[in-house]
Amino acid sequence: MKIIQASVECAPFIKAGGLGDVVYSLSKALSIHHDVEILLPFYPLLFPAFSSQVLDEHVFAYNFLGRQNATATSYRYEGMTLTVITLDSQLELFSTSTIYTEDDTLRFSAFSAAAAAYIQKLDKVDVVHMHDWHVGLLAGLLKEPHLPSYPKRIFTIHNFSYRGYCSTQLLGASEISDFGLSNYQLFRDPSTSVLLKGALYCSDYITTVSPSYAQDILNDYSDYEIHDAIMSRRHVFCGILNGIDENIWNPETDPALAVRYGTHLLKSPDVLFTKKEENKIALYEKLGLSLEYSPLMCVISRIVEQKGPEFMKAAILHAMENSYALVIAGTCYDQETQRQFTNLQESLTTSPNIRIILDYNDPLVRLIYGAADMICIPSHFEPCGLTQLIGMRYGTVPLVRSTGGLADTVAAGVNGFTFSHTDNFNDFFHMLSQAVSTYRHEPDVWFQLVEEGMLRPSGLTTMAAHYLGVYNSLL
């Protein structure tokens, strides 16, 4: 089967969050038995240099604000084809210092127009799998009435809060037909279109990244026209739980760890916890923390409203009052949050038990996973979440809000701790206190939580099998 994965992120090349990880992991799992090609836009200032074999390179035309030229360069990478599309005559759109900017609907619609032109020139494509609203226009462009044939289109919602509202005139720049454009337009305001809305109507099947989040989406009334769109397609909509790549996230082989360990040590809990402790010592030395403070809780997250930054701040107070260590590693995406957390970071530089790191440093993050006893994920909503899956893989017990994919993967008393209420901090503090108390006073119970998490299948094989089932059902 020829499968194309279209996205604006793919680890390890271009990544801002979990989207890039999922696109890479799913593609790699599918490529074992199928011909998988990943389409990415070229970001001149961001794309890393790499020496993979070039399979093909050619120039082609696409329509967006007139006739434009693009170059498709295809590489062989880990059994897959990675095709990077450079918008030669509109290169300034992607010459940015960050993946996402204020002009994303324009930039990514131009990429979608180029991707559609590229796909239409290929000999045979069975499935085009589009990831999130960024490539929503691609669904409509691949369903144009004048096309002699078109592949089956799968669209995955990674975060329903981001939808791609834009001007209808902007989408018209792709020369999409009036019929196609109508799928994107809002009835209440035809001058406004929504990339997500059009993708819902123009795709053969729609998925999201966990079963619980699928229900959250069906119960979301924040925009009644988007709600009508998803309800009209609910018979071809489901949640498929994300997974992680066990080869990438593996404490037995991770070079960033001071000491490696794995599930084979579950037969010798004392040895396992000694190795976790050695990683903790290495991290404490690196960050200047005092070894007197234990357990170690971490937060590894984008610091945005969705992720519960107010709970992250509350955790700092709880750690101070209860004498355990806390490391927060994350990136802020707005100036006010950046200001607040920078002030906190500066005020805690001499703290013996708390550190805030406002940067994503992959080796450091991996060491944190290996050193931490617990990982806190206080999200207001969470489509799936990958950090809890990685944490469990590294023997780090998840403390989560029971929502979306977190509810699907973390069960209180089985492999972690949960809280529900977000109107105050009482439920959250109760969860933290329960986790710290269990660690300190009930080592046998704590080991059972760690064991359950480390033995949990990553879900990557299952995820790929579910998607293959969807693909096959459409062919």
Swiss-Prot record:
SUPFAM superfamilies, per database record: UDP-Glycosyltransferase/glycogen phosphorylase
Record's keyword terms, sorted: Glycogen biosynthesis, Glycosyltransferase, Transferase
One Gene Ontology term of the molecular function aspect: alpha-1,4-glucan glucosyltransferase (ADP-glucose donor) activity
UniProt xrefs under InterPro entries: Glyco_trans_1, GS/SS, Starch_synth_cat_dom
Binding site for ADP-alpha-D-glucose: K15
PANTHER family named among the record's database cross-references: GLYCOGEN SYNTHASE 2-RELATED, PTHR46083
Family: Belongs to the glycosyltransferase 1 family. Bacterial/plant glycogen synthase subfamily.
Protein name in the entry: Glycogen synthase
Source organism per UniProt: Chlamydia abortus (strain DSM 27085 / S26/3) (Chlamydophila abortus)
